[in-house]
């Protein structure tokens, strides 16, 4: 059935001849529209080679390519003969099409045109973030050493800079600043020019302060905004108290405050700095008689008393705002500020000098080592495009440049793409409301500028809005609109959430599907506003416990599912639920709480690889080998299960030498203890390997000598632990292959990964599909879930970027704190105050967009969980104050100063509900008065269910465990004896099934199909009454000898050779390995990695493998590389009597196995499975032996066939292909 597109979707598909910006809101079918646009262009004769399609992740590019391939194949089935050939050509060239990340495309330009800029083509991409940081650190260390040199002409200025941010012995802070400044510059096409301009705000030109660009452009707007908001607040108070005679003096006091604010507003426009400062310092007393005796004693004036109390709070708020101005911008007079600016200019000038020196040195080092990093890609590609001939050539290659997720683009990437464009063929798709990658230098203003410009009638370019939301149940969409039509505008959020920017509910759900937008507020008693670590933990635990309880209850309900029959409803499954968080910090507690409640979980993207016990211990061993004079790693290694020194032995080591470090004490202790001496001998052996710079050999030697791999296999989660250790070996090999060597540098590399929040996920293992998914909001972007939970909604926004001695903001530049050397006084410069305010707006805007992403992930039900203190939060930032001020606000959007005061998603949400009817919140926070009308853009049809729960009443649910009840008094009733007799006399109905293995491998049960009587001839067991009875379990008697029993004299078994041959065929690259030498190389690598025994390797028939690789069937495999599956595991249930003729019942048996390989032909919807066999076949009797071979494995292969047929519904699984390697024949098994 063809997709029915909306009017705007159709426009987005068909429009051409302009630059086009598609503003695609959440759930608007953006990807479907993109693919349809591409397909329509292809059907009109435009080749996929004529498209440049860029997005921001490799996964997104891969998905785009796959979806386009599926769409072409679909059209191919219904195409006429004239189109078929063209579409088939498109499928052939699709793998080489320009569908990639922007960096990948820039790399392609460099690889093709490197000669234009004189670049050595033998470069390596520095894609490892930790490796790049290490190289940066080494280069920076050398650069700083040069500036520390007294002979350097900038030495004195440099020392002043160092002392402003630390001291020569502790310049870590300065190093971080230089690296961060460099990163900002690298995200721009004009990086060097941007750095040079950072001095400008600090230049003292002699002109009055209020005439400088810094004041006119930045400081004055901030002052006027604050004053405007305060005047508005004062006017609202005056309206409230007008006509109340008892508050006449209060009215006079507010008139005085109003006159004061109006005076400052005027002077900010024209007065010199010192005159303005004097006016601001002359604050009115603001004394009000808000609680006179007459008001208190008259019960009829209780409402007036409440108003008076509120007014007092408003006065406190006004004074607080003015005090913040006085203690920041107006802390100094003009002469003092100019002195601070002058000295700060010297700091900034030196900082830029050092940063430029670092950038140049880093660039030179990369060239010398033939390295390119990701920022280089865009810069060098632009340098190539500066050649006019090359630029015109590249521009002529593309009919259209399609940019997905355009809101996440940075300035350098924008410049690159516009350089490739011919000026009217850019097709940009995105949603600025979902721009959440500011930490990667994403520039949402690039989107918003076009959003406004392209909407103008005189513009040659066009904007198309896709606002229809086909994902979320209408109530979720309406509440999302209710919130954002009040908090997101151009000043906070970068776009006014109104008109076309709003979501339009279009999702088709039946009326009986529950409309759930639930807010759980946990109320906690607290006397102090400042939270201790214990309070944070208890608050978090309470939220997680409540969340677990909600999930368990949801499992008893139903959700809508279009695939469900007959009513479209089915029970809620764990996999329907996602928990989205702002950060990963609470994951350990969250997972623990959910699992304790019996809820399975799957955690996405948690970097905890280096924290796993088995890997952490290996890193400690490496640290000890590199430098044994580290007490903590050494003690950890000794105490570990590998060496098993107990507390008494550790104490004895310390006693052996109390004066020196622990390593020296261990050496002394080893003179009288063999166990300690053995440890020293091992460390010495490993150190000798380490000195040879063979990191890979060292790690494997540790595994060999300690049997650590085998040990962890016996621990809980043993397979995962072994995978982690194998992964460490692979990381080391990759590191070493990248021309790096040395244990010390590898340890630094790992520590860089850890300290840079770049920890890796554990080695991949199969995950439980039926589990609640836990991920960050960032990771959830682009995904959707039937039910979404948002815990820790009260968590304060991260303000780390607003702190520190130097702040950087892409538009305002850098703000520095100047430390006066003599007085050691730290003074935030005016520029720093401006930058800090800009950073706060930028950070709050990003948080607002993150909130939008979080809310729009939910399809049917959304649950918010947060905690609130009922005491301790004083002043105008208290939740009650925010509620009241929001309730009394005028206009569509809540006042900006209120939105900036709120510091959590919960506060924004509650503020948005203040002007709606919500009885629970009004009873809790309100004053009983009716709210002001909310703006016309805000829908009032949505329903928010609010639940208030005391934290002390929450208890985490625990999964129930069934067990027998204990009788404590030792007495038993007749009912107990009857129950016991029933249990003892119980006859199990399926006794035969207990004598049959419920879990059987295909390689074992294939013997039954080979000889049906074999089941009767299996090992018999003797029962207690002396009767013989078959065990009904198939066994493989041939087991490899353990290493300590194998002296090398025993010839490897044929099965061992067969296993090794299978391993080679499992790992071989059909497209590259096609010679005897290449197969032998792979075999030798597997021997070196100890995956094939040295005694087995010579027995592998290389010629047989090569003959197969050159066969027609191998060519079929190569043609289906994209759909080829090797070593595919499966499991399926079969009735026992289908396998065991001796059984009468049909009790289920779990069959598991591994298929050597199969490939899928999407065009014909068929599957071909194949299986390698190394059995000996006699050439003289080849037909007879092949017939026996076919009979021997027929049952096994038919089980594989059944398994694939169950997995691929709608596909036809053909006859299995048995590959007899010994004679190079492929047999079709009927």
Swiss-Prot record:
Keyword terms of this UniProt record: ATP-binding, DNA damage, DNA repair, DNA-binding, Exonuclease, Helicase, Hydrolase, Isomerase, Nuclease, Nucleotide-binding
Cofactors, names only: Mg(2+)
GO molecular function (one): double-stranded DNA binding
Domain UvrD-like helicase C-terminal per the UniProt entry, residue ranges: 500-782
GO biological process, one term: double-strand break repair via homologous recombination
UvrD-like helicase ATP-binding domain ranges (all copies): 3-473
Reaction equations catalysed: Couples ATP hydrolysis with the unwinding of duplex DNA by translocating in the 3'-5' direction; ATP + H2O = ADP + phosphate + H(+)
Enzyme Commission numbers on file: 3.1.-.-, 5.6.2.4
Entries under InterPro entries matching the protein: AddA, DNA_helicase_UvrD-like_C, DNA_helicase_UvrD/REP, P-loop_NTPase, PDDEXK-like_dom_sf, PDDEXK_AddAB-type, Restrct_endonuc-II-like, UvrD-like_ATP-bd
Pfam families registered for this protein in UniProt: PDDEXK_1, UvrD-helicase, UvrD_C
Entry-linked PANTHER family: ATP-DEPENDENT HELICASE_NUCLEASE SUBUNIT A (PTHR11070:SF48), UVRD / RECB / PCRA DNA HELICASE FAMILY MEMBER (PTHR11070)
Family: Belongs to the helicase family. AddA subfamily.
Subunit and interaction comment: Heterodimer of AddA and AddB/RexB.
HAMAP family from the UniProt entry: AddA
Protein name, entry field: ATP-dependent helicase/nuclease subunit A
Species the sequence originates in: Leuconostoc mesenteroides subsp. mesenteroides (strain ATCC 8293 / DSM 20343 / BCRC 11652 / CCM 1803 / JCM 6124 / NCDO 523 / NBRC 100496 / NCIMB 8023 / NCTC 12954 / NRRL B-1118 / 37Y)
């Amino acid at each position: 059935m063809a997709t029915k597109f909306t009017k705007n979707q159709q426009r987005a598909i068909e429009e051409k001849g302009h630059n086009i910006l598609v503003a695609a809101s959440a759930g608007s079918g953006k990807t479907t529209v993109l693919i349809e646009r591409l397909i329509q262009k292809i059907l009109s004769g435009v080749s996929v080679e004529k498209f440049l399609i860029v997005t921001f992740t490799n996964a997104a590019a891969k998905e785009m390519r796959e979806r386009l391939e599926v769409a072409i194949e679909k059209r191919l089935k219904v195409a006429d003969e004239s189109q078929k050939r063209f579409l088939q050509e498109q499928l052939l060239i699709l793998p080489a099409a320009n569908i990639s990340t922007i960096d990948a495309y820039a790399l392609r330009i460099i690889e093709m045109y490197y000669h234009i800029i004189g670049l050595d083509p033998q470069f390596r991409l520095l894609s490892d973030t930790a490796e790049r940081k290490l190289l940066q650190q080494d280069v920076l260390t050398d650069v700083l050493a040069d500036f520390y040199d007294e002979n350097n002409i900038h030495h004195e200025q440099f020392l002043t800079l160092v002392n402003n941010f630390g001291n020569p012995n502790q310049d870590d802070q300065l190093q971080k600043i230089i690296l961060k400044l460099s990163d900002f510059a690298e995200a721009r096409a004009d990086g060097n020019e941007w750095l040079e301009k950072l001095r400008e705000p600090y230049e003292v030109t002699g002109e009055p302060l209020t005439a400088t660009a810094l004041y006119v452009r930045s400081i004055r707007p901030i002052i006027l905004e604050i004053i405007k908001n305060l005047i508005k607040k004062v006017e609202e108070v005056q309206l409230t108290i007008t006509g109340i005679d008892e508050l006449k003096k209060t009215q006079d006091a507010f008139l005085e405050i109003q006159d004061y604010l109006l005076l400052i507003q005027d002077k900010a426009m024209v007065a010199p700095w010192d005159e303005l400062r004097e006016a601001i310092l002359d604050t009115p007393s603001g004394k009000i008689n808000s609680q006179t005796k007459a008001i208190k004693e008259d019960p009829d004036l209780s409402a007036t008393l409440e108003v008076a109390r509120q007014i007092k709070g408003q006065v406190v708020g006004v004074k607080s705002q003015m005090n913040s101005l006085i203690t920041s911008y107006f802390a100094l007079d003009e002469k003092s500020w100019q002195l601070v600016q002058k000295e700060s200019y010297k700091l900034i000038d030196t900082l830029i000098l050092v940063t430029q020196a670092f950038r140049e040195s880093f660039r030179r080092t990369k060239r010398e080592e033939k390295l390119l990093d990701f920022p280089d890609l865009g810069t060098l590609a632009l340098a190539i495009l500066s050649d006019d001939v090359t630029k015109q050539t590249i521009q002529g290659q593309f009919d259209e440049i399609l940019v997905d997720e355009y809101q996440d683009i940075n300035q350098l990437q924008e410049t690159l793409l516009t350089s490739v464009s011919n000026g009217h063929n850019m097709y940009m798709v995105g949603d600025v409301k979902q721009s959440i990658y500011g930490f990667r230098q994403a520039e949402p203003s690039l989107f918003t500028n076009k959003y406004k410009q392209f909407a103008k009638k005189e513009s040659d370019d066009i904007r198309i809005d896709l606002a229809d939301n086909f994902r979320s149940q209408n109530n979720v969409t309406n509440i999302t609109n209710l919130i954002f039509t009040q908090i997101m505008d151009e000043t906070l959020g970068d776009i006014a959430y109104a008109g076309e920017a709003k979501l339009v509910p279009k999702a088709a759900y039946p009326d009986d599907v529950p409309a759930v937008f639930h807010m759980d507020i946990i109320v906690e008693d607290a006397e102090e506003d400042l939270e201790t670590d214990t309070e944070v933990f208890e608050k978090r635990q309470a939220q997680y416990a409540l969340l677990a309880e909600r999930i368990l209850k949801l499992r008893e309900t139903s959700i809508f599912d279009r695939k469900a029959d007959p009513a479209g409803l089915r029970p809620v499954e764990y996999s329907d639920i996602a928990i989205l968080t702002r950060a990963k910090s609470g994951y350990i507690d969250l997972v623990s709480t959910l699992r304790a409640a019996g809820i399975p979980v799957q955690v996405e993207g948690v970097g905890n690889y280096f924290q796993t016990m088995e890997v952490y211990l290996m890193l400690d061993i490496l640290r000890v080998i590199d430098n044994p004079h580290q007490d903590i790693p050494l003690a950890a290694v000794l105490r570990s299960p590998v060496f098993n020194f107990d507390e008494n032995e550790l104490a004895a080591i310390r006693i052996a030498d109390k004066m020196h470090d622990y390593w020296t004490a261990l050496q002394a202790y080893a003179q009288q203890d063999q166990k300690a001496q053995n440890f020293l001998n091992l460390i010495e052996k490993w150190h000798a390997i380490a000195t040879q710079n063979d990191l890979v050999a060292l790690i494997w030697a540790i595994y060999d000598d300690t049997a650590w791999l085998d040990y962890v296999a016996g621990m809980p989660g043993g397979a995962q632990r072994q995978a982690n250790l194998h992964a460490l070996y692979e990381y080391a090999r990759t590191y070493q292959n990248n021309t790096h060597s040395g244990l010390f540098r590898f340890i630094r590399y790992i520590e860089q990964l850890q300290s840079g929040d770049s920890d890796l996920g554990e080695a991949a293992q199969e995950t439980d599909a039926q589990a609640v998914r836990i991920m960050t909001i960032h990771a959830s972007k682009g995904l959707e879930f039937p039910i979404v939970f948002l815990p820790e909604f009260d968590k304060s926004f991260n303000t780390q970027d607003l702190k520190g001695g130097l702040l950087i903001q892409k538009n305002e530049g850098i703000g520095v704190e100047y430390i006066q050397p003599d007085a050691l006084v730290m003074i935030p410069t005016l520029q720093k105050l401006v930058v800090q305010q800009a950073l706060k707006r930028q950070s709050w805007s990003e948080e607002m967009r993150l909130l939008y992403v979080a809310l729009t992930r939910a399809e049917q039900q959304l649950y918010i969980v947060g905690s609130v203190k009922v005491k301790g939060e004083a002043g105008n930032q208290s939740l009650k104050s925010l509620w009241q001020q929001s309730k009394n606000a005028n206009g569509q959007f809540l006042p900006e100063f209120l939105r900036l005061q709120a510091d959590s998603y919960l506060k924004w949400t509650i503020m948005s509900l203040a002007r709606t009817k919500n009885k629970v919140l009004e009873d809790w926070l309100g004053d009983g008065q009716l709210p002001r009308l909310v703006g016309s853009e805000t829908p009032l049809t949505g329903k928010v269910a609010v639940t208030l729960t005391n934290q002390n009443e929450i208890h985490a649910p625990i999964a129930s465990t069934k067990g027998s009840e204990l009788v404590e008094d030792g007495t038993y009733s007749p009912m107990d004896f009857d129950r016991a007799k029933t249990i003892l006399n119980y006859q199990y109905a399926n006794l035969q099934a207990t004598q049959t293995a419920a879990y059987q491998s295909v390689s074992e049960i294939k013997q039954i199909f080979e000889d049906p009587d074999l089941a009767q001839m299996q090992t018999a067991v003797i029962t207690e009454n002396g009767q013989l009875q078959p065990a009904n379990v198939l066994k493989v008697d041939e087991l490899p000898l353990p290493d300590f029993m194998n002296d090398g004299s025993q010839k490897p078994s044929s099965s061992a050779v067969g296993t090794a041959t299978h391993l080679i065929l499992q790992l071989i690259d059909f497209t590259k390995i096609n010679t005897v030498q290449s197969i032998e190389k792979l075999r030798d690598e597997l021997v070196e990695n100890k995956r094939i025994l040295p005694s087995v390797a010579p027995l592998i028939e290389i010629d047989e493998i090569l003959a197969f690789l050159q066969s027609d069937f191998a060519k079929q495999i190569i043609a289906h590389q994209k759909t080829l599956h090797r070593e595919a595991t499966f499991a399926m249930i079969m009735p026992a009597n289908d396998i065991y003729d001796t059984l009468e019942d049909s009790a289920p048996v779990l069959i598991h196995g591994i298929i050597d390989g199969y490939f899928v032909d999407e065009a014909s919807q068929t599957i071909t499975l194949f299986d390698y066999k190394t059995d000996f076949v006699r050439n003289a009797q080849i037909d007879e032996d092949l017939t026996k071979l076919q009979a021997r494995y027929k049952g096994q292969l038919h089980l594989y066939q059944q398994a694939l047929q169950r997995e691929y519904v709608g596909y036809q699984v053909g006859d299995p292909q048995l590959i007899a390697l010994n004679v190079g024949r492929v047999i079709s098994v009927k």
